[in-house]
């Protein structure tokens, strides 16, 4: 541990990171990073690490092994988790709370093409039964409309969540997906 590093508790470090990234990330991404950093901070506390200055390459390696083996994360999830931890440590290095070399030494899991694809599919028969049920008992409910849109368009769930009333064209009728970066 370097003598010129500040003593910053892991939970305080999380707050510093989220404040620093507030302007750079969308609300949803910031929330995701918060969950990922919270998992890392909790693990650090379980390891009796009370200052971020104590975190080194071996600490991050042990966390990665813990997430993979004990928490059962798949490679693509682990890559996202460790990538966020690396960003976290870079921000902390910028405020002298972590040795700057730690973040740069982190090796991310390699995800081969196709490993990041979720192969789960909703079978046609199941989808039709669900839609029939919703048509009869929950017509025009949020669940009904969401399943109907997903089934008819093959849209990703993230796209569905991003839809706004202005995306519906009554003339066509059609839905138009638009990227809406956060307003500053």
Predicted regions mapped to residue ranges:
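Short alpha-helical hairpin
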Residues: 4-17
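Hydrophobic core segments within long, regular secondary-structure runs in both alpha-
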Residues: 10, 57-64, 124-131
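N-terminal core-binding DNA-recognition domain of tyrosine recombinases/integrases
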Residues: 15-117
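Short, surface-exposed helix/turn micro-motifs that flank interaction/cofactor sites
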Residues: 86, 161-162
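DNA breakage-rejoining catalytic core of tyrosine-based enzymes
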Residues: 112-129, 184
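Basic, Lys/Arg- and aromatic-enriched nucleic-acid-binding interface segment
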Residues: 124-157, 161
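Conserved tyrosine-mediated DNA breakage-rejoining catalytic core shared by Y-recombinases
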Residues: 162-184
């Amino acid at each position: 541990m370097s003598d010129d590093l500040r003593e910053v508790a892991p939970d305080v470090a999380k707050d510093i990171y989220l404040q620093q990234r507030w302007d750079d990330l969308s609300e949803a991404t910031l929330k995701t990073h918060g969950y990922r950093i919270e998992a890392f901070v909790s693990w650090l506390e379980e390891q009796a690490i009370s200052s971020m200055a104590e975190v080194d390459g071996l600490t991050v390696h042990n966390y990665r092994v813990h997430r993979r083996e004990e928490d059962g994360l798949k490679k693509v999830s682990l890559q996202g988790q460790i990538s966020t931890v690396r960003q976290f440590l870079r921000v902390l290095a910028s405020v002298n709370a972590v040795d700057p070399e730690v973040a740069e030494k982190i090796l991310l899991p390699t995800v081969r093409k196709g490993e990041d694809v979720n192969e789960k599919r909703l079978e046609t028969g199941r989808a039709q039964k669900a839609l029939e049920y919703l048509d009869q008992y929950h017509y025009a409910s949020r669940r009904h409309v969401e399943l109907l849109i997903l089934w008819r368009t093959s849209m990703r769930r993230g796209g569905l969540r991003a839809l706004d009333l202005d995306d519906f064209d009554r003339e066509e009728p059609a839905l138009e997906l638009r990227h809406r970066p956060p307003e500053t």
